[in-house]
């Protein structure tokens, strides 16, 4: 859509992109990212789900669980840095190649080492490309669509979580059946991603900045306040979603290993679509306070559930309530990550924020191994409180990005 247009200044580029009408190129960009995030959602809970496979001994569960965030962490840091250097579009073929190799490895795996390496490789590709995808979407979409598109695309990961968890619930009697359905679902997303990615344009913002950055004095990494706030948000969402929905199953409720991520993923997917109605009607700062305050309170109620030994049904209700605030917190974070960094450092900035969170997540898997459910929930509540602090800081010290052009 921009090949026939020439730009003399960066403001011309921004005005052109920010005021554009939705067209076929926007549809292709949204579709390829939705398919990629859906496949990532399938992979996001693959590690805890495959701990049920007989060739994974309980003593190796923790290493399987770590393989997923380890691959995602490596992918985020490497791909985020490279995307600022060589462009967004070029990396999308690399990421999908790595992801496909990992998926094939998961299907063919017959032992612990193979599944470990395959999950790492798949997450490196599809999980690692989230950084590049968020930067690309924020840079290419008009202001009036930017927030909704970022939420819509990232929410497809929740749909993937719910879908693959449902497969493991229904087909839990057969590893072969699980693998075949997983392969079919992955291939459907991968095929759409490949076809659409071949038609993707390069990020126009990145192209202009990369060739004129010496003239653009505003292309600096940024002040510490936005970076700190984004790190606090990332710590909350990464630790609480992954820990409550993914890790709680294998450690504390082995009978419900598939059911817990299914309920949480389905709840977040449904709420994600509902959030589209009001995400651009409320300022980002207020939305962040709503999300992280609600999440902190709902997580604290889990402590009462454990203290009074309430039925598992009550746990499910609390899980759904927390899923709403979890999705709202996820949405705010997904929107603000690309909005608060400049184009020259957007990939590196998002990768840095996510890198800190996933590093802590990996540490927490080992640190929390064997602790009581009550102490576990105290940790989760404290993690939500971290995000609440970040939201208060951003509300009082930050600036509004709703309906504002990004640099």
Over which residues does each language-model region extend?
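Conserved MFS/SLC helix-loop-helix module at the cytosolic interface between two early adjacent transmembrane helices
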Residues: 74-110
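Cytoplasmic helix-loop-helix junction between adjacent transmembrane helices
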Residues: 118-155
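Central cavity-lining transmembrane alpha-helices of secondary-active solute carriers
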Residues: 66-81, 262-274
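Cytosolic juxtamembrane N-terminal segment immediately preceding the first transmembrane helix
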Residues: 1-47
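Glycine-rich segments within core transmembrane alpha-helices of 12-TM secondary carriers
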Residues: 145-172, 189, 353-365
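Structural signature of the two symmetry-related core transmembrane helices
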Residues: 90-104, 287-302
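Extracytoplasmic gate region of multi-pass secondary transporters
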Residues: 47-48, 220-273
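Hydrophobic core of transmembrane alpha-helices in multi-pass small-molecule transporters
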Residues: 114-128, 313-328
């Amino acid at each position: 859509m921009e090949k026939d247009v020439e730009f003399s200044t960066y403001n011309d580029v921004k005005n052109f992109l920010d005021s554009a009408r939705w067209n076929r190129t926007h549809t292709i960009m949204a579709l390829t990212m939705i398919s990629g995030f859906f496949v990532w959602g399938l992979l996001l809970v693959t590690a805890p789900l495959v701990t049920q496979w007989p060739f994974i001994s309980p003593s190796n569960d923790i290493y399987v669980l770590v393989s997923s965030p380890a691959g995602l962490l490596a992918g985020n840091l490497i791909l985020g840095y490279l995307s600022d250097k060589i462009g967004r579009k070029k990396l999308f073929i690399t990421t999908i190649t790595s992801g496909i190799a990992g998926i094939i490895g998961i299907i063919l795996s017959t032992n612990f080492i193979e599944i470990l390496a395959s999950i790492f490789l798949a997450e490196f590709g599809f999980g690692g490309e989230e950084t590049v995808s968020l930067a690309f979407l924020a840079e290419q979409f008009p202001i009036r669509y930017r927030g909704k598109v970022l939420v819509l695309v990232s929410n497809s990961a929740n749909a993937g979580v719910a879908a693959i968890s449902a497969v493991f619930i229904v087909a839990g009697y057969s590893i072969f059946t699980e693998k075949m359905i997983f392969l079919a679902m992955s291939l459907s997303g991968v095929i759409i991603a490949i076809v659409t990615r071949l038609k993707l344009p390069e990020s126009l913002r990145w192209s202009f900045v990369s060739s004129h950055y010496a003239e653009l004095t505003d292309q600096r990494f940024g002040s510490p306040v936005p970076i700190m706030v984004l790190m606090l948000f990332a710590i909350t969402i990464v630790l609480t979603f992954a820990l409550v929905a993914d890790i709680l199953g294998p450690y504390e409720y082995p009978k419900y290993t598939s059911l817990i991520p299914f309920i949480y993923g389905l709840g977040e997917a449904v709420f994600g679509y509902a959030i589209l109605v009001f995400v651009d009607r409320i300022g980002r700062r207020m939305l962040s306070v709503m999300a992280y305050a609600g999440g902190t309170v709902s997580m604290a109620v889990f402590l009462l559930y454990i203290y009074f030994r309430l039925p598992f049904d009550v746990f499910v209700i609390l899980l759904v309530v927390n899923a709403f605030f979890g999705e709202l917190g996820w949405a705010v974070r997904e929107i603000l990550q690309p909005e608060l960094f400049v184009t020259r450092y957007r990939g590196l900035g998002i990768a840095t924020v996510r890198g800190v969170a996933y590093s802590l997540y990996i540490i927490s898997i080992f640190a929390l191994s064997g602790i009581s459910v009550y102490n576990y929930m105290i940790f989760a509540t404290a993690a939500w409180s971290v995000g609440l602090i970040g939201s208060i800081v951003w509300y009082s010290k930050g600036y509004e990005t709703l309906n504002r052009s990004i640099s």
